[in-house]
């Protein structure tokens, strides 16, 4: 079979991702485009004659970049297409918005690259009384047009057949430009590098005349002739860029008049009716908060019901199973405990997180695909404008509920570097799925019937602190106003099950692989440091271990937030959590249960793997039956409690160590707000600079320590009023000094707002050699 590389390109909300998932299924690989941290998705699929590599390009409305303030997505798409890596392009077009989508189509066809138009969302178009003549559209465009309903898989086989039959586009003159424009474009094309095809040279010439700033990187000497060409054109027309765009829109209007009845189209009545409520200025925000709470409640509820299968099952396989192998093969006791507690305990920490995190990703994917997330950004626009940000900056922040890494990377969709940078600084405060696992454990141990409310309050606190961080930046080192907010609101539709499953699986797989490696390694090292003293002797009591000795020295620093000296395990959890937040649960589980594991006698004769696995399945089934009972719906944390006996096990020890719900909640505040995990730090450094990464770390530590201290000292004021008053005043005074210093430093850091463009500039410079892909 021949190998074929295809670029998949289209407008945002055209169904491009759904089509990508339909074609490639689970055969996907996610990486980054060279030079920038924009996500690059590739997938594999086969047709009758070809083995296809499908590259999912970022959604974009056009290939023209008028300003360096523009989104990175347009630049990446343009660079890839001009690199020549794609043998064929599939342009996904939204049939219900044909006129707007055809602007990108015309630009692609003018390039002369073989192209197939995938006319998607025909079901939505039909509901709006839109009729499109497919054959007439294909004839006018000079390329195949394949009707699709990607959410239902309709038209996929026809698209694969068109891929096998692909050929050069018919030589149809689509756009009738003014003759002076063509003359100047041809004159620029003559001095461009000869290895660029003639059609692409003329296209680049038109792009330069239109004001595209990145086409000059490909034009060679032609860029030196641009000013003279524009001067000659201005003697004959007012604005060359306007004439070019107008010629394209006239062509699009002529095509639509012939092939469709868009003038008699009817808007979606359902979408219009729902938007009157969802976008209401008074109801919009409460509805958004309710949707977020419902998402959290269902994730905790259903995920908690599935937890026994992963928890009890992993204990049977990786803890008791390893112990059985160790005793059967006569391993030394220390080795058996080390493997069971380190390796087995690490795996047992990762797997129980899967149901709740998976449910969270599933519901996020549902909200994104259904069209609600765009409405959430619109609802939050007024609040974001107060921060000097456009409403669409809230979209990457919402993604942070799943993971902060794509939240940071999602800032690339914003137009201005200042807006990107502010959003990046706010993103780490959004409570990710890994933090949810920590909150659920603490809620079950300390808050009982109020567990759901406690966890929801932490989610809201994260949003509030992100907003306050934005306000702080706006009035200190990042003064400025938001760009006008224009955003397309897609019609509501029911997401395709296959697409939801694939998106959830891709996110969950990345989480498990990333978290699993770190948790297991950390658990093994913690077990080792728990087994030896500072002098190198083996210890029977973890309180005499090297880890305990070192941690006790550091723990007094956290006394103001309610971590007592004998609770050194909590200090270790904070340090390991800097690697990955999910490691906090693994660390506390390993340390709080260490003594119990060492003291327990394991009888290999009584071990029955089948019986333990059956117990896990039975417990899961019972939990699922009870999941939607009224009592569980009112208190979803109980469904995921996982350790019913509070006097024994990790949760019992944790309850004793913290001593009060106030101390536990203060600890959770610190976990929510302090240092981002390593992967988020790396994303911040790549998207902005190391300096801004350092600022994010220091600001997060300050906010976490300050807020946790204020909460705990106010909550425990009656126990030690003098100490509490000193701590409160010290925190307030320190933050006044910090804000004052940031205001004075404003003039020194403005230049750094361009940091997000450095990697793009290098990518653009490398594009002529084909390296920007």
From Swiss-Prot:
Q: Where is it mostly found?
A: membrane
Membrane-protein topology: Multi-pass membrane protein
Write the record's keywords in alphabetical order, separated by commas: Cell inner membrane, Cell membrane, GTP-binding, Ion transport, Iron, Iron transport, Membrane, Nucleotide-binding, Transmembrane, Transmembrane helix, Transport
Effect of disrupting the coding gene: Poor uptake of Fe(2+).
| Segments forming domain FeoB-type G | 3-169
The entry marks the following residues as binding GTP 3, namely: 56-59
Name the segments for region: NFeoB, GTPase protein domain, binds GTP but not ATP: 1-274
One GO process term, biological-process aspect: iron ion import across plasma membrane
TM annotation in the entry: 282-302, 309-329, 344-366, 383-403, 427-447, 453-473, 518-538, 664-684, 691-711, 722-742
Q: Which SUPFAM superfamilies match?
A: P-loop containing nucleoside triphosphate hydrolases (SSF52540)
Which residues make up the binding site for GTP? Answer: 120-123, 149-151
What GO cellular component is one of the record's annotations?
A: plasma membrane
Q: Which residues lie on this side of the membrane: Cytoplasmic?
A: 1-281, 330-343, 404-426, 474-517, 685-690, 743-773
| Topology Periplasmic: residue spans | 303-308, 367-382, 448-452, 539-663, 712-721
Q: Which domain of life is it from?
A: Bacteria
The entry marks the following residues as binding GTP 1, namely: 10-17
Effect ascribed to mutating residue 154 to A: Dramatically reduced GDP release-rate, in construct of residues 1-270. GTP hydrolysis rate 2.7-fold slower than wild-type
Please state which protein family the record places this protein in: Belongs to the TRAFAC class TrmE-Era-EngA-EngB-Septin-like GTPase superfamily. FeoB GTPase (TC 9.A.8) family.
What is this protein for, i.e. what is its function?
Transporter of a GTP-driven Fe(2+) uptake system, probably couples GTP-binding to channel opening and Fe(2+) uptake. A guanine nucleotide-binding protein (G proteins) in which the guanine nucleotide binding site alternates between an active, GTP-bound state and an inactive, GDP-bound state. This protein has fast intrinsic GDP release, mediated by the G5 loop (about residues 149-158). Presumably GTP hydrolysis leads to conformational changes and channel closing.
Q: NCBIfam families in the record, alphabetically? A: feoB, PRK09554.1
- Free-text note on domains in this protein's UniProt record: Contains a guanine-nucleotide-specific nucleotide-binding site (about residues 1-276) that shows slow GTP hydrolysis. When a non-hydrolyzable GTP analog binds to the trimeric N-terminal domain, it induces a structural shift which opens a pore.
What is the name attached to this protein's record?
Answer: Fe(2+) transporter FeoB
Source organism of the structure: Escherichia coli (strain K12)
This protein's gene is called feoB
């Amino acid at each position: 079979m021949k190998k074929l590389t295809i670029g998949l390109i289209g407008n945002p909300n055209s169904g491009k991702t759904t089509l990508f998932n339909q074609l490639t299924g689970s055969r996907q690989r996610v990486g980054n485009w060279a030079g920038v941290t924009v996500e690059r998705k590739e997938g594999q699929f086969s047709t009758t004659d070809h083995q296809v590599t499908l590259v999912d390009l970022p959604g974009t409305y056009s290939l023209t970049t008028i300003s360096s303030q523009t989104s990175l997505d347009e630049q990446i798409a343009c660079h890839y297409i001009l690199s020549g890596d794609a043998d064929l392009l599939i342009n996904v077009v939204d049939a219900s918005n044909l006129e707007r989508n055809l602007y990108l189509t015309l630009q692609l066809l003018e390039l002369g690259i073989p192209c197939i138009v995938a006319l998607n969302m025909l079901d939505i178009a039909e509901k709006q009384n839109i009729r499109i003549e497919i054959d007439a559209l294909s004839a006018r465009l000079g390329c195949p047009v394949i009707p699709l309903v990607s959410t239902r898989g309709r038209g996929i086989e026809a698209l694969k057949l068109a891929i096998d039959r692909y050929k050069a586009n018919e030589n149809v003159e689509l756009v009738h430009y003014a003759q002076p424009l063509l003359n100047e474009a041809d004159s620029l094309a003559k001095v461009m590098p000869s290895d660029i095809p003639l059609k692409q040279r003329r296209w680049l010439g038109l792009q330069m005349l239109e004001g595209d700033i990145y086409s000059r990187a490909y034009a060679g000497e032609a860029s030196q002739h641009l000013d003279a060409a524009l001067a000659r054109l201005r003697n004959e027309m007012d604005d060359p860029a306007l004439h070019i765009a107008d010629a394209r829109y006239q062509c699009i209007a002529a095509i639509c008049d012939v092939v469709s009845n868009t003038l008699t189209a009817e808007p979606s009545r359902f979408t219009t009716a729902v938007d009157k409520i969802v976008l209401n200025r008074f109801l919009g925000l409460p509805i958004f908060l309710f949707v977020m709470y419902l998402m959290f409640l269902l994730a905790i509820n259903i995920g908690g019901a599935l937890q026994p299968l992963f928890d009890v099952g992993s204990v049977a396989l990786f803890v008791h199973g390893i112990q059985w192998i160790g005793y059967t093969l006569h391993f030394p006791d220390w080795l058996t405990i080390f493997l069971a507690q380190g390796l087995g305990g690490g795996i047992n920490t990762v797997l129980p997180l899967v149901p709740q995190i998976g449910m969270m990703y599933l519901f996020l994917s549902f909200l994104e695909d259904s069209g609600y997330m765009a409405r959430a950004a619109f609802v939050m626009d007024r609040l974001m404008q107060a921060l000097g940000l456009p409403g669409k900056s809230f979209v990457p922040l919402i993604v942070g509920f799943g993971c902060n890494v794509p939240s940071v990377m999602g800032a690339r969709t914003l137009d201005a570097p200042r807006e990107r940078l502010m959003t990046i600084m706010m993103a780490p405060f959004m409570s990710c799925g890994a933090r949810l696992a920590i909150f659920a454990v603490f809620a079950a141990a300390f808050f009982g019937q109020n567990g759901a409310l406690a966890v929801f309050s932490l989610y809201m606190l994260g949003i509030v602190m992100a907003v306050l961080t934005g306000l702080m930046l706006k009035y200190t080192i990042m003064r400025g106003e938001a760009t006008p907010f224009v955003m397309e609101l897609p019609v509501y539709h029911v997401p395709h099950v296959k697409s939801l499953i694939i998106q959830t699986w891709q996110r969950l797989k990345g989480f498990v692989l990333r978290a699993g490696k770190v948790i297991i390694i950390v658990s093994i090292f913690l077990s080792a440091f728990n087994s030896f003293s500072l002098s190198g002797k083996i210890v029977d009591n973890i309180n005499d271990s090297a880890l305990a000795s070192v941690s006790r020295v550091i723990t007094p620093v956290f006394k103001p937030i309610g971590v007592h000296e004998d609770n050194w395990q909590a200090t270790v959890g904070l340090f390991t959590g800097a690697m990955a937040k999910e490691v906090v649960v693994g660390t506390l589980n390993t340390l709080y249960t260490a003594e119990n594991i060492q003291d327990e006698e394991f009888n290999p004769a009584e071990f029955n793997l089948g019986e333990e696995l059956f117990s896990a399945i039975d417990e899961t089934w019972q939990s699922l039956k009870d999941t939607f009972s009224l009592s569980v719906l009112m208190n979803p944390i109980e469904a995921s409690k996982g350790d019913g006996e509070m006097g024994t096990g990790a949760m019992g020890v944790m309850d004793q160590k913290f001593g009060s719900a106030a101390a536990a909640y203060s600890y959770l505040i610190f976990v929510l707000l302090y240092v981002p995990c390593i992967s988020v730090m790396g994303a911040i450094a790549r998207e902005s600079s190391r300096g801004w990464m350092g600022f994010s770390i220091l600001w997060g530590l300050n906010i976490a320590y300050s807020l946790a201290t204020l909460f705990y000292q106010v909550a425990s004021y009656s126990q030690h009023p003098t100490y509490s008053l000193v701590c409160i005043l010290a925190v307030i005074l320190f933050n006044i000094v910090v804000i004052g210093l940031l205001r004075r430093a404003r003039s020194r850091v403005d230049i750094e707002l361009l940091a997000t463009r450095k990697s793009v500039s290098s990518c653009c410079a490398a594009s002529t050699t084909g390296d920007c892909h």
